[in-house]
Amino acid sequence: MAFNFNWSPLMADASFYTRAQDLLTAALNKSPKPPIIVDDIIVTELNLGSIPPELEILEIGDLAEDRFRGIFKMSYSGDAFLTLKTRVQANPLNTYLLTRPSFASPLPLAAATPLTIPLQITLSDFKLSGFVILVFSKQKGITVVFRNDPLESLKVSSTFDSIPFVRDFLQREIEAQLRILFMDELPAIIHRLSLRLWVPEYRAGEEDQDQNTNTAGEGPGQDPLASPPQDPVDALGNALNESEIASLSLDSSVETHSLFSQKNLLRLAALTDSQRTLSLFTPSIQEVVYRAWTSPSDQGDISGGVTSPLSPALSRTQSQVGGMSSFQDNASTISSYSRTSTSTHTFSTYGLNLGAGRHSKAHARKRKKRVVDLRRPKQPESETASVTDESSFTETTSAPSVRSAPLPRVNEQPDDPVTPPLSPDSDFHLPPIPERHRFSISRPALRRDIATEMLRETGESSSEPARRHAEVDDIDATPRTIIRHEPSRYEGEKQEAGPSRQLPSTILPFTEEKSTPGPVDQALVERIAGEIARRMREDKLMGTNSCAFWNRPGHEESPPPAYGQ
């Protein structure tokens, strides 16, 4: 089966070429152009030539009077040509810098000056070969689809043929663009041309669209001053009167100020401020876009700053760090008695950090040394008792406490109104408790310390046989021996003080059933009971907070009593 194509009517129709040139121009400018081309590509001349393409029928799928579908093998080596006109950039440095970010370029002044040269390109000697799927319908036009890349070669002639480098570059670029044109744009162009030829409705719709486009482009422009805003202002933000608005026009020789609503100016100012910085002391620099700025609601917070009539003043925002407790100078704040969080103890005051070195985790538990070096010279009984007391207190030591300073001794009136006089100095003194053990002892050891302090304040002395008898009775060699064997020389004073109160359960470790309580013993026991009750009340007030010692209200420290009394 053979077909006879009438190629001459297509060459004679001038309107067909005009429409084809417009479609080709739109198709060439649709895809992204290389940076060297700085202007639109315009098709100035198009000629299909006198030699038709050769078609070989491979398959016919549908055949009727008004429709046809088949697969062809096409080959073309004719005299068709195409002429294009555009402008190119002759300075390669300018092209290079346009494709790079500004911060990565040296920004030359004269070397990157653009130099555009008009360029005319003629494409001829097309050689095409490929498989084409052709679908023809009078209602839907012609649809052509290339199953492969049909372009084999073509000849590119330009004004830069004398420069081999530019000629080869243009050859490669144009071939790449034409391959895209044949595969994507040419089928759409052929389909639109066929609709214009065989479908009258499509032709009438295109004519109406062209008329509407021409009508919209003609006529005088709209005057934006015909309906001015309600509250117009000039470029400096000053309000304009009606007479000043009437004097303004588009054709006026006087410089026309842009009229904006005050509400819109505030919105634009807020939008501009939102892109500025959050820095407190960043000046307002012209032609500089900041990242962010504070909101216009905070414009009254700053006293001095760079302001403009179009934007509110820069406000100062106070930033706070969450989770960190601030220090207060008032030591009597009630909230300081409670433990808020871990960060409160992390950022402690200076006083609590004085003993942090000796209460570190590396020295939390001191090794207990119960071995006595017998090679040393023999010590007196008082020193031996001191060693025994030290070891006994070490054995009752619990986990290290968080307190870094001893509790202060407060001068307070005791429960007993009668205070016995201090006894004269004696050669025997109670052994002092080392500071490191007194800081870290538990509750029972603290009560022993209270009894020792009370006896140290009274400073009473006893006879040597009584001390030996106390050492035999009491194995622990604690100050309880002296409590049970005090001389009864304050009997008369105790009777004047009144009947004794019932002892609390906390004093039971200091008493013994087999000992006969005397008047002096009752007086000391009552004093010790009152001291223990007072300290228990203070402990309940202070709680377990390590900062409670420094925040106790209404207490003044007094120096400890002299140990030599």
Curated annotation (Swiss-Prot):
UniProt keyword terms in alphabetical order: Lipid transport, Lipid-binding, Membrane, Mitochondrion, Mitochondrion outer membrane, Transmembrane, Transmembrane beta strand, Transport
Cytoplasm keyword on record: no
Membrane topology category: Multi-pass membrane protein
Signal peptide, first to last residue: none
MF GO annotations: lipid binding
GO cellular component terms, semicolon-separated: ERMES complex
Record-linked CDD domains: SMP_Mdm34
Entry-linked InterPro entries: Mdm34, SMP_LBD
PROSITE patterns, per database record: SMP
Regions of compositional bias (Basic residues) in chain numbering: 358-370
Record domain SMP-LTD: where: 1-195
Ranges of biased composition (kind: Polar residues): 382-401
Compositional bias (Basic and acidic residues): 371-381, 446-472, 483-496
GO biological process: mitochondrial genome maintenance; mitochondrion-endoplasmic reticulum membrane tethering; phospholipid transport
Domain of life: Eukaryota
Principal place of residence: mitochondrion
Cell compartment(s), UniProt: Mitochondrion outer membrane
Region (Disordered): 207-236, 296-317, 348-504
Claim: Oxidoreductase is one of the keywords in the record: no
Assembly behavior: Component of the ER-mitochondria encounter structure (ERMES) or MDM complex, composed of mmm1, mdm10, mdm12 and mdm34.
The protein's role, per its UniProt record: Component of the ERMES/MDM complex, which serves as a molecular tether to connect the endoplasmic reticulum (ER) and mitochondria. Components of this complex are involved in the control of mitochondrial shape and protein biogenesis, and function in nonvesicular lipid trafficking between the ER and mitochondria. Mdm34 is required for the interaction of the ER-resident membrane protein mmm1 and the outer mitochondrial membrane-resident beta-barrel protein mdm10.
Record family assignment: Belongs to the MDM34 family.
Entry's free-text remark on domains: Lacks alpha-helical transmembrane segments, suggesting that it resides in the membrane via beta-sheet conformations similar to those predicted for other outer membrane proteins and porin. The SMP-LTD domain is a barrel-like domain that can bind various types of glycerophospholipids in its interior and mediate their transfer between two adjacent bilayers.
PANTHER family, per database record: MITOCHONDRIAL DISTRIBUTION AND MORPHOLOGY PROTEIN 34
Designated name of the protein: Mitochondrial distribution and morphology protein 34
Native species: Aspergillus terreus (strain NIH 2624 / FGSC A1156)
Gene name of the encoded protein: mdm34
